[in-house]
UniProtKB/Swiss-Prot annotation:
Function: Catalyzes the attachment of isoleucine to tRNA(Ile). As IleRS can inadvertently accommodate and process structurally similar amino acids such as valine, to avoid such errors it has two additional distinct tRNA(Ile)-dependent editing activities. One activity is designated as 'pretransfer' editing and involves the hydrolysis of activated Val-AMP. The other activity is designated 'posttransfer' editing and involves deacylation of mischarged Val-tRNA(Ile).
Upper classification of the organism: Bacteria, Bacillati, Cyanobacteriota, Cyanophyceae, Synechococcales
Record-listed L-isoleucyl-5'-AMP binding positions: E570
Annotated source species: Synechocystis sp. (strain ATCC 27184 / PCC 6803 / Kazusa)
One Gene Ontology term, aspect cellular component: cytoplasm
Gene from which this protein is expressed: ileS
SUPFAM superfamilies associated with the record: Anticodon-binding domain of a subclass of class I aminoacyl-tRNA synthetases, Nucleotidylyl transferase, ValRS/IleRS/LeuRS editing domain
CDD domains reported in the protein's UniProt record: Anticodon_Ia_Ile_BEm, IleRS_core
Protein name: Isoleucine--tRNA ligase
Family affiliation: Belongs to the class-I aminoacyl-tRNA synthetase family. IleS type 1 subfamily.
Length: 988
């Protein structure tokens, strides 16, 4: 008995060194090293032919390890930058860091012993803070680069460098000389725990804050002119009722504000149980206050709010009389009494009203939050601790406390120390937003906001905001370059002094403010002018630091950037942070927004949609995603591309989830894309596009349909990138790899690729499509899966078109590939194929067949002799479609025949067409497949086509595994079919 002949070496199996596994932890750093050694980013950034695109980096804080928010933000930016590079734009991305401010200062102080803190000078603290910031910045930079982020890493911008600080002084100076900077005693958000003023963006409002709210009666001493007659019967036993959630501010009370549009009532208290028998309250609140006080209130008389103006009352705890004044629409009947306790030193609205009435600014609280001597017997008490208790007790002693109750509400906390803040009037430096508010609002309208609700968020923030307090009482920051006359305390701030300090800081850095004497810091003209000066001790708000980056970076002469820049991209919290501070400084100095487009993203949550916190144990660490955890089996190293794919998969306009379940799904998708590319690479091992590619007009229909499909897919991908909707890229590419390629085209292609003669036209035609799909797919995924794309490119089995995939340009689509009419037929055919696959799967499950090649497919002629009028269009299509199917004859053995048979498409050994009358009962499986037929008027008609699956005829070919009745017909090769016989001779 002769041994069976082996045909293994005659089959064109895939060949590639491209690994099935990503080995990301090893391979990604190698690819990053390759980019660096070849200078890929620098070459493209400088030499691409199209206009410069600048996405200006919002500086993360140089403090602590990177978290998922950093990853989301930086990867989004990098996807956009890499897409722009592939589109041919020059791109200069300068990563930045915010290096000054309280958080770093606190970290330094926490690292010192109490004895060291006591001896700390401002300069020593600054040196330690600088070292801390630089170390954190360098660690973060390494992390960002491991994400695959491209940028000018050798020359980032740091807000602590002399050139940056000097540019910031320049912005401050320009605003000062325009009259937008002033010094004033105003209430500001003050953090007793940090002992400094805070900006709105440095506050947070945690849930669950409870205040001691009180209702208090202030005895009326004299009625105002308009109310005298109405109040006369009650004046000797009358009080005004107020409500406050901050009892500690009562020592600063200088007025009671009302709403002139509201109606107020004099009410009599049942049994006259209070200090005064009659109270003034808002009419709409009488019933509610009766319930609150637990006493019946009877309305005696009503009067309009404006008539109560200038009615006076006695402060219950201090020997002073104050007026009732007209406030604004902030006085409502939603809570309280409709009358608001007003302390101009402890609130912005109170301050504005106080200025209108010429009230003094009384703020008897020191930097630590302790009441001062101006608070009389309450001096020394802390406003956030024991002051409330003492003041409430004193009110009770005076019998003016109407009610106390716990009140849960949102209250501002210091975002760093996590402790409550207060409003406190202090001498501060302000930017007068009022001076350029209208310009800022106009500039907002000229910006493209993505998503569009971003404009709706920032507009009221700018429209309603008060002047910007830009001074801080800390050492680690850029100094406000002001001098004070020793005799009068008048500030000295002129063009000459600002320019002189700016030049010094440009040369020596801001430490010079502390190192040099006043004489050295002053221009010569001010050194001997008969006056003596002292340096100011305030530093600038860090939001002024980062808000000046458009001047220090984008508009810097030593950087190849531009101003305004194309895009700012940060989290949605930056509408009140960096987006706003940048807008205000740029508009104040130049009258324009510093950006053309602003894109915002949400926050990262855990898999269940909860906020991440160490206490909950639900923190996902980007470092661990990339490098794996301690137990690599439970927490494997997924690499940066999986992290980047996650960013592209989510709708970042909202808050986005991440967790192990999501990551595992993304790994599967990354692997599917990788394995698709590996198949393409492996089947191009002997293909040279220069000599082997088949011209479009010579391609069979299936291949031309796939080119049409590529135009659809990669046009959608391009639109996804252009609209910054990367989740659409994610869905489209995933679908293309799995549905169009793996499950359809490549499934069909294996027969042509493996079985045909190596140089057969039908095989070369298929390889032409594979090569175009591979290169376009690689380019399309490159902005997101940058390491995988480069890995694929480096393993191209023919001469690479360019050194790096990023030098190859964007996807290459030919207009002639678009063939919608051709596509319509193939869409219907794919629907038919899906139905056939289900029937084959059923036969497999029942073990009637193993492989689909063991089956013969029978298609029953759906054409009828007559058609009704309504169905005529659909019937005509069915006639034509069935006829088209019948034309898929077996290809001849002419070497130039590139036809694809239906059995290849359906992956069966035979396909047969029969009339319905010919159906025999022995047929095994029968099903009706409904296909959608698109009419000329775009209406859809559904038509059924009957299909039958039965056992294939003949015997199995040992080479291609198809069944054929001609197996055994060839004496030299008795175990192969007619196709394989011709293929071995080079004819098929």
């Amino acid at each position: 008995m002769t041994e069976a002949k082996s045909y293994k070496d005659t089959v064109n199996l895939p060949q590639t060194r491209f690994d099935m596994r990503a080995n990301a932890n090893k391979r990604e750093p190698e690819i990053q090293q390759y980019w660096q050694e070849k200078g890929i980013y620098a070459d493209l950034a400088d030499n691409n032919p199209k206009d410069l695109f600048v996405l200006h980096d919002g500086p993360p804080y140089a403090n602590g390890a990177l978290h998922m928010g950093h990853a989301l933000n930086k990867v989004l930016k990098d996807i956009i930058n890499k897409y722009k590079l592939l589109q041919g734009h020059k791109v200069h991305y300068v990563p930045g860091w915010d290096c000054h401010g309280l958080p770093i200062e606190l970290k330094v102080l926490q690292s010192l012993k109490s004895s060291e803190r006591a001896e700390l000078t401002p300069l020593t603290l600054r040196h330690k803070a600088r070292d801390f910031a630089l170390k954190a910045q360098q660690e973060q930079a390494v992390g960002f680069q491991r994400y695959g982020i491209w940028g000018d890493w050798k020359k980032p911008y740091l807000t602590l460098t002399p050139e940056y600080e000097a540019a910031q002084i320049g912005v401050f100076g320009a605003m000062a000389l325009k009259g937008y900077i002033y010094r004033g005693l105003k209430p500001v958000h003050w953090s007793p725990s940090s002992r400094t003023a805070l900006a709105e963006a440095e506050l947070e409002y945690p849930e669950g804050h409870t205040s001691r709210s009180i209702y208090v009666s202030f005895p009326i001493t004299q009625a105002g002119e308009k109310a005298a007659e109405i109040l006369a019967p009650y004046i000797d036993d009358l009080a005004v009722a107020i409500w406050t959630t901050t009892p500690w501010t009562l020592p600063g009370n200088l007025a009671v504000a009302l709403n002139p549009e509201l109606t107020y009532a004099v009410v009599e208290t049942e049994s006259h149980i209070f200090h005064r028998s009659y109270l003034i309250v808002a009419l709409d609140l009488v019933e509610k206050l009766s319930e609150t006080f637990g006493v019946k209130l009877t309305v005696k008389v009503t009067l309009q709010g404006e008539s109560l103006e200038n009615t006076c009352y006695q402060h219950p705890l201090f020997d002073r009389v104050s007026p009732i004044v007209i406030g604004g629409d902030y006085v409502t009947t939603e809570s309280g009494t409709g009358l608001v306790h007003t302390a101009p030193g402890h609130g912005q609205e109170d301050y504005v009203v106080g200025q209108r009435y010429g009230l003094p600014i009384l703020s008897p609280v020191d930097a630590a939050g302790n009441l001062t001597e101006e608070a009389g017997k309450f001096a020394g008490l802390n406003v956030l601790n024991d002051a409330n208790e003492a003041i409430i007790n004193a009110l009770q002693d005076q019998k003016v406390l109407l009610k106390e109750e716990a009140y849960e509400h949102k209250y501002p906390y210091d975002w760093r120390t996590k402790k409550p803040t207060i409003f406190r009037a202090t001498e501060q430096w302000f930017a007068s937003v009022e001076g350029f508010r209208d310009q800022a609002l106009k500039a907002i309208k000229e910006v493209t906001w993505i998503p569009t609700q971003g404009e709706n968020r920032i507009t009221p923030m700018v429209g309603d905001r008060s002047d910007w307090c830009i001074s801080r009482q800390r050492a680690w920051g850029v100094p406000i370059p002001v001098f004070y006359d020793e005799e009068t305390s008048e500030p000295l701030l002129t063009e000459e002094t600002i320019n002189h300090v700016q030049q010094i800081i440009a040369e020596k850095g801001s430490d010079a403010w502390w190192e040099l004497t006043v004489e050295e810091l002053l221009p010569e003209a001010y050194r001997n002018n008969g006056r003596t000066y002292r340096k100011g001790e305030d530093t600038m708000d860090v939001w002024f630091d980062s808000g000046s980056s458009w001047a220090a970076v984008a508009n810097a002469k030593n950087r190849p950037l531009k101003y305004p820049v194309d895009m700012y991209l940060e989290g949605s919290d930056q509408h009140r942070g960096w987006f706003q501070s940048s807008l205000l400084t740029s508009v104040a100095v130049n009258g324009i927004a510093p950006y053309k487009t602003v894109l915002t993203h949400g926050f990262v949550l855990d898999e269940k949609g909860h906020k991440m916190s160490k206490s909950l144990g639900n923190v996902v660490d980007p470092y661990q995603i990339i490098n794996g955890g301690k137990n690599q089996k439970q927490e494997p190293a997924y690499g940066a591309d999986v992290l980047r794919l996650w960013v592209a998969s989510v709708d970042y306009a909202n808050d986005v989830p991440i967790g192990q379940g999501i990551l595992k799904q993304l790994v599967d998708i990354r692997n599917k894309i990788r394995n698709t590319a590996r198949f393409l690479l492996g089947n191009l091992h002997d293909f040279n596009p220069e000599t082997d590619a088949v011209a479009y007009e010579d391609l069979p229909e299936l291949d031309r349909y796939m080119l049409h499909r590529m135009t659809e897919v990669f046009t959608e991908v391009t639109e996804a990138y252009e609209s910054f909707q990367f989740f659409k890229f994610f869905q489209t590419v995933q679908n293309f790899c799995v549905v169009d390629l793996s499950n359809f085209y490549l499934d069909i292609a294996k027969d042509r690729l493996y079985i045909s003669a190596p140089n057969a036209p039908r095989r070369r035609s298929c390889q032409t499509i594979l090569q175009l799909a591979l290169e376009n797919l690689t380019k399309a995924i490159a902005p997101v899966l940058c390491h995988l794309a480069e890995d694929i490119w480096q393993f191209l089995p023919y001469e690479k078109p360019t050194e790096s995939v990023f030098q190859s340009g964007w996807v290459n689509l030919d207009a002639q590939w678009q063939q919608p009419q051709l596509a319509q037929k193939w869409v219907s055919l794919r629907q038919l194929r899906d139905g056939i696959n289900q029937l084959l799967e059923q036969a497999r499950r029942d073990k009637v067949i193993g492989s689909s090649l063991e089956a013969k497919l029978i298609i029953v002629d759906p054409r009828t002799a007559e058609s009704g009028t309504d169905e005529k269009q659909g019937e005509n299509f069915v006639h034509w479609f069935y006829g088209w199917l019948e034309n898929f004859n077996e290809p001849t053995f002419d070497p130039n025949d590139r036809k694809i048979s239906l059995r290849n498409i359906f992956l069966t050994s035979q396909v047969e067409f029969i009339k319905s009358a010919e159906i025999e009962p022995s047929f095994t499986y029968e099903e009706t497949v409904v296909i959608n037929l698109e009419r000329h008027d775009n209406n859809i008609r559904t038509k059924p086509i009957k299909i039958i699956v039965t056992k294939a005829d003949g015997h199995k070919c040992e080479r291609c595994w198809n069944y054929s009745t001609q197996v055994g017909s060839f004496s030299d090769d008795p175990t192969i079919c007619e196709r394989c016989n011709e293929a071995l001779q080079g004819n098929f």
